[in-house]
From Swiss-Prot:
This is Bifunctional protein GlmU. It is found in: Cytoplasm. Acetyl-CoA binds at residues 376, 419, 436. It catalyses: alpha-D-glucosamine 1-phosphate + acetyl-CoA = N-acetyl-alpha-D-glucosamine 1-phosphate + CoA + H(+); N-acetyl-alpha-D-glucosamine 1-phosphate + UTP + H(+) = UDP-N-acetyl-alpha-D-glucosamine + diphosphate. Residues 248-453 are annotated as: N-acetyltransferase. Its cofactor is Mg(2+). UDP-N-acetyl-alpha-D-glucosamine binds at residues 7-10, 21, 73, 78-79, 140, 155, 170, 224, 329, 347, 362, 373. The active site is at 359 (proton acceptor). GO terms for molecular function: glucosamine-1-phosphate N-acetyltransferase activity; magnesium ion binding; structural constituent of carboxysome shell; UDP-N-acetylglucosamine diphosphorylase activity. It comes from Prochlorococcus marinus (strain MIT 9211). Gene3D superfamilies: Hexapeptide repeat proteins (2.160.10.10), Spore Coat Polysaccharide Biosynthesis Protein SpsA, Chain A (3.90.550.10). Transmembrane segments: none annotated. Pathway: Nucleotide-sugar biosynthesis; UDP-N-acetyl-alpha-D-glucosamine biosynthesis; N-acetyl-alpha-D-glucosamine 1-phosphate from alpha-D-glucosamine 6-phosphate (route II): step 2/2; Nucleotide-sugar biosynthesis; UDP-N-acetyl-alpha-D-glucosamine biosynthesis; UDP-N-acetyl-alpha-D-glucosamine from N-acetyl-alpha-D-glucosamine 1-phosphate: step 1/1; Bacterial outer membrane biogenesis; LPS lipid A biosynthesis. The gene is glmU.
Length: 453
C-alpha cells in the first residue's frame, strides 16, 4: 500500500500574514494545492494532510478535495512530532509513506516518480530528495558515501563549523517504509537547539537510507517569506511564458507580463507589456492584448484587440476592439464586430453584433441589439435606490450624445434618441425620441463682476 502525508501545520511567521503560509498564492493557485497537484497521479491509498495553525481555514480551502484526510498537530513541535500524529491513524497500515512539505510548490511529478523508482530498486528503509546549494544556510546537511547511502542529516542550527561547509542539503521530501518508521517515531528526542522533534533524526536510526539528488534545485525551493514567494512566482511565470511562446504566443516584454496556469491561448497572439491574465481565461487566434491590460476569467474569440483595459468574467466574440481605458465587468457578453472605446464601462449586459459604444458611456443591466450606435456620454440609469433595472435597446438604434435612459425602459428597433435627452418611457420602433428643456437666451447678459463695477 502507499500513503502520502503533507505537512501543513506551521504558522509561517516569517511570511507576516494573517492566514496560513500554505494558502499563499502562486500564479493563482495556493502552495498546498500545487503540492497536491504534483502527486495526484501517484494514486495513494491514503492521502493525509497534517494541519495545525488555522486548521479550519486550510480544510475549508481544500473542501472540494473529498479524498483528503486531516490530522491535527497541536501544538507544533517539529516535523518528527507531526509524523507522530499518524501513529494511531496508520496503526494497521503496511507500505510506503511519502512525506511532503506544504510549502514546496514547484516539485514535479516526474521527480517524485524517480524517487519512488529509486526507493523500490534500492529497497532502502527511507529514500529522500537532496539538493546541492551554493548557499545552504538554513538547510539540514546530508552526509553520505559515493553510493548515495546516508550516514546522517544534521540540521543547520546544530551543524559544527566544519559540517556547515557541506553543500549537500536535505530537501525534506521523504519516502519511508512505514513499518520501520513507526517503531522509531516514539523514540525521537527534542534534545537540540530548537527543542523540537526532527524527522531527520529517524533516518540515522533506520537500517538503510538513500538520497536522490535533484536535477533542478528550483523544484525543492521552500517558501518561508515574501522574498521566496516572489522568487517562486517568477520561476512559474517564466516557465508558463516559455511554454506558450513555444506554442505560438508572442510576448513583447515577457518579464512585465503574468498569466495564470488555467489560461489557454490560440496561435499568433501578441501580448504587449504590462498585461496580466488571471483565473480561467481563453484567448483565441490572432488576438492582441495590451499594453497595460488586465483580463480575468474571460473568453475572447479570434482577432480581438484589447488595449489598456480591464475585463472580468466576460465573453467576447471575434473581431472586437476594446479600449483604451474600457472596463468590462462580470456577465458582459459582446458579440462579433463590436467596438468598445475609451472610458466605457459595461456591466451585466449583452451587446449585439456590430454595435459600437465608442466613448464615455455606462451600460449596465442592458440588452443592446445589433448595429446599435451608442453616442458619447450615453448612460443607462439602472439603479433606483432599491434594485437594478433593465434597459433594452433594439437593433439599428442610435442614441445621441449625453443621453440618459432611465430603467426600466425599452427602446425599440431603428429608434433615434436625440442628443441630451433623458428618457423615462418606452419608445416604439422607428421613432425619434427627444426630450430637452427649452433653450433660453438672455442677450446682453452681465456677470456679477460686471454688475458690481
Amino acid at each position: 500500500m502507499f500513503a502520502i502525508a503533507i505537512l501543513a501545520a506551521g504558522k509561517g511567521t516569517r511570511m507576516r500574514s494573517s492566514y496560513p503560509k500554505v494558502l499563499q498564492q502562486l500564479a493563482g493557485r495556493s502552495l498546498i494545492k500545487r503540492v497536491i497537484k504534483s502527486c495526484e497521479d501517484l494514486k495513494p491509498d491514503r492521502f493525509l494532510v497534517i494541519v495545525g495553525h488555522q486548521a479550519e481555514a486550510v480544510q475549508d480551502h481544500l473542501k472540494e478535495l473529498s479524498h483528503l484526510e486531516y490530522i491535527n498537530q497541536v501544538p507544533q513541535k517539529g516535523t518528527g512530532h507531526a509524523i507522530q500524529q499518524l501513529l494511531p491513524v496508520l496503526d494497521n497500515f503496511i507500505g510506503d509513506l511519502l512525506v511532503l512539505n506544504g510549502d514546496v510548490p514547484l516539485l514535479k511529478a516526474e521527480t517524485l516518480q524517480k524517487l519512488i523508482a529509486k526507493h523500490k530498486t534500492s529497497k532502502a528503509s527511507v529514500t529522500f530528495l537532496s539538493a546541492r546549494l551554493s548557499n545552504p544556510k538554513g538547510y539540514g546537511r546530508v552526509f553520505s558515501n559515493n553510493q548515495d547511502e546516508v550516514d546522517r542529516i544534521v540540521e543547520d542550527a546544530d551543524c559544527s563549523r566544519e559540517e556547515k561547509s557541506n553543500k549537500l542539503t536535505n530537501a525534506g521530501i521523504y519516502l519511508f517504509k512505514w513499518d520501520l518508521l513507526k517503531n522509531i517515531l516514539p523514540k525521537l528526542s527534542s534534545t537540540n537547539k530548537q527543542s523540537e522533534l526532527y524527522l531527520t533524526d529517524a533516518i540515522s536510526q533506520l537500517p538503510t537510507a538513500i538520497h536522490l539528488e535533484v536535477d533542478n534545485i528550483d523544484e525543492v525551493s521552500g517558501v518561508n517569506d515574501r522574498a521566496q514567494l516572489a522568487n517562486c512566482e517568477n520561476l512559474i511565470q517564466q516557465s508558463l511564458r516559455n511554454h506558450w511562446m513555444s506554442k505560438g504566443v508572442s510576448f513583447i516584454d515577457p518579464e512585465s507580463c503574468t498569466i495564470s496556469e488555467e489560461s489557454q491561448f490560440g496561435i499568433d497572439i501578441v501580448i504587449e507589456p504590462q498585461t496580466h491574465l488571471r483565473g480561467n481565461c481563453f484567448i483565441g487566434n490572432n488576438c492582441r492584448l495590451g499594453p497595460s491590460t488586465y483580463i480575468e476569467d474571460s473568453r475572447l474569440g479570434e482577432n480581438v484587440n484589447v488595449m489598456q483595459s480591464t475585463l472580468n468574467n466576460c465573453q467576447v466574440a471575434s473581431h472586437v476592439k476594446i479600449g483604451p481605458f474600457a472596463h468590462l465587468r462580470p456577465e458582459t457578453n459582446v458579440s462579433s464586430n463590436c467596438r468598445i472605446g475609451n472610458f466605457v464601462e459595461i456591466k451585466k449586459s449583452e451587446l449585439g453584433q456590430g454595435t459600437k459604444v465608442n466613448h464615455l458611456s455606462y451600460i449596465g443591466d442592458s440588452h443592446v441589439g445589433c448595429h446599435v450606435n451608442i453616442g458619447a456620454g450615453t448612460i443607462t440609469a439602472n439603479f433606483d435606490g432599491f434594485r437594478k433595472n433593465e434597459t433594452v435597446i433594439g437593433d439599428h438604434t442610435k442614441t445621441g450624445a449625453n443621453s440618459v435612459l432611465i430603467a426600466p425602459i425599452n427602446i425599440g428597433n431603428r429608434v433615434t434618441v436625440g442628443a441630451g435627452s433623458t428618457l423615462t418611457k418606452n419608445v416604439p420602433d422607428g421613432s425619434l425620441a427627444i426630450e430637452r428643456s427649452k433653450q433660453n437666451i438672455k442677450e446682453n447678459w452681465k456677470t456679477r463682476e460686471e454688475t458690481n463695477q
